[in-house]
A protein has these predicted regions:
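Glycine-/small-residue-rich "gating" segment that lines the acyl/pantetheine channel
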Residues: 64, 173-177, 191, 195, ...
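Flexible, low-complexity linker/loop segments at domain and module junctions
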Residues: 7, 12-35, 141-146, 311-317, ...
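Active-site nucleophile and cofactor-binding loops and adjacent substrate-binding regions
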Residues: 55, 117-122, 144-146, 177-185, ...
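Conserved beta-ketoacyl condensing-enzyme motif
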Residues: 35, 56-180, 196, 210-221, ...
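ACP-dependent fatty acid/polyketide chain-elongation machinery
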Residues: 2-114, 265-277, 374-389, 428-437
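Active-site-proximal alpha-helical scaffold in enzymes
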Residues: 125-138, 179-211, 251-272, 364-385, ...
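Condensing-enzyme catalytic core mediating Claisen C-C bond formation in acyl metabolism
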Residues: 32-36, 63, 233-311, 320, ...
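Acyl-CoA/ACP chain-elongation machinery
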Residues: 201-248, 282-295, 325-333, 349-401
Length: 437
């Protein structure tokens, strides 16, 4: 130990001495970033239009879990049934598969010659990425444009090496990034991509999150941690109930959400349609407990406050919040307290719309943040705040006009905040606003 102290006290000796230090690096202006393309695969359907329509129509993507859903190919039937019987949670939010409209085509994305070895969560990412790129009308072929296009797509549980499949679809030499921050992965991926554009690393970024963790091992692990809903195994569609007094855990889900982010002038010059502007990105850490947030929501408060400060907007200018609320007893209450702390009188005025869309989609883990960011962008575009399903008996933390939406609400939404808070205390808030004029 004493030897280590002696080493650390030694002065740094440089081989080459300079009489003059370098000038500071050039100060690059922070560029504005907008959303120009959207793509989704969710338990509500495949595609942005189908998912959004079912969400605002108050439909639910949760269903009963079956032994076949455990994906235990190669095991005998007795082992599969024994495993299924041991699970305390028997509901899940599963992507609908098939050939029809709004269905995920497994033959195209998992069984075709090009995708036969593709992991399911990567197939979801590729499907939503293709939709987002076509929506943005950004399919570059020139080397210069491809070099200025990057990818930032993360997964919560899947193999991160497979993210390269999405990168190869999009770019040759642009930034290539994959965040892995539990349930905040999708939000961090979008926020990090925004900063890459702001600092000039790219002009276009394809960003989001993806997840496919409905399998025996993942579900068993969450069951052991007592994180999943177990009271409503016989009533799957009411099992995910954010902010409700009778909530008892989250419903595991799967899917992907991807958006195309673009530097504002770049988007304008090519005549791209602009959904919204990314105004703020706030991050924080709880450092409190591996699965439990601080009851006062200190980490959430910091993330939301930092997003607001970066945006230049006043809390009263935010019209909608898509809450992280997963339907867990502690997490939902902590976030509700945090929102009330940050938005104060605005939260109790009735002017601030608040909902958790996980009542409809379940918890998509690594994809939750990106899917809910897209919901926030669509809320701005369509002037509709989506509902919180199964909110029959609101938690006592809500009072004095402070109450989540239980039905869809048509309203002007100038700015929307999307929260994502992951296990381990990793938090992210994204703030979107109406497109610049």
């Amino acid at each position: 130990m004493e030897a280590l102290r002696r080493i650390t006290r030694r002065p740094i000796r440089r081989r080459f001495l300079s009489s003059q230090a370098f000038d500071p690096p050039p100060a690059a202006p922070r560029r504005r970033v907008v959303v120009t393309g959207l793509g989704m695969v969710t338990p509500l359907g495949c595609g942005v239009g189908e998912t959004w329509r079912r969400l605002v129509d108050e439909r639910c993507g949760v269903r009963a879990l079956t032994p076949a859903d455990l994906r235990m190919d190669g095991f005998d039937e007795a082992t599969v049934m024994h495993t299924y019987d041991q699970l305390t949670a028997k509901v899940a939010a599963i992507v609908p598969c098939g050939k029809g409209e709004g269905k995920f085509d497994e033959e195209q994305w998992l069984q075709s010659k090009d995708h036969r070895s593709t992991s399911r969560f990567i197939a979801y990412a590729l499907c939503s990425t293709e939709e987002a790129l076509r929506d943005a009308n950004w399919l570059p072929t020139e080397p210069e444009k491809k070099e200025r296009t990057g990818v930032s797509i993360g997964g919560g549980i899947g193999s991160i090496s497979d993210i390269l499949d999405a990168a190869q679809l999009i770019c040759d030499k642009g930034p290539n990034h994959a965040a892995v921050t539990a349930c905040a992965t999708g939000a961090h991926s979008i926020g990090d991509a925004t900063r890459m554009i702001q600092f000039g690393d790219a002009d276009v970024m394809v960003a989001g999150g993806t997840e496919s963790s409905i399998d025996a091992l993942s579900i068993a692990g969450f069951c052991r941690s007592r994180a999943l809903a177990t009271k409503y195994n016989l009533l799957p569609q009411v099992s995910s109930r954010p902010f409700d007094c009778d909530r008892d855990g989250f419903v595991i889900g799967e899917g992907s959400g991807v958006m195309v982010l673009e530097e504002l002038n770049h988007a304008k010059e090519r005549g791209a349609k602009i959904y919204a502007e990314v105004r703020g990105y706030g991050m924080s850490g709880d450092a409190y407990h591996i699965t439990q947030p601080h009851i006062d929501g200190k980490g959430a408060i910091l993330a939301m406050t930092r997003a607001l400060e970066q945006s230049g907007l006043h809390p009263n200018q935010v019209d909608y919040i898509n809450a992280h609320a997963t339907s867990t007893p502690l997490g939902d209450a902590a976030e509700a307290n945090a929102i009330k702390s940050v938005f104060s009188d605005h939260a109790t005025s009735g002017a601030l719309a608040l909902s958790s869309t996980k009542g409809a989609t379940g918890h998509l883990l690594g994809a939750a943040g990106s899917v809910e960011a897209i919901f926030s962008v669509l809320a701005i575009c369509h002037g509709i705040a989506p509902p919180t399903l199964n909110l029959l008996n609101p938690d006592p933390v809500f009072h004095d006009g402070y109450l989540p939406l239980s039905t869809s609400k048509k309203m002007q939404i100038r700015a929307a905040l999307s929260n994502s808070f992951g296990f381990g205390g990793t938090n992210a808030s994204l703030l979107f606003a109406c497109p610049p004029t």
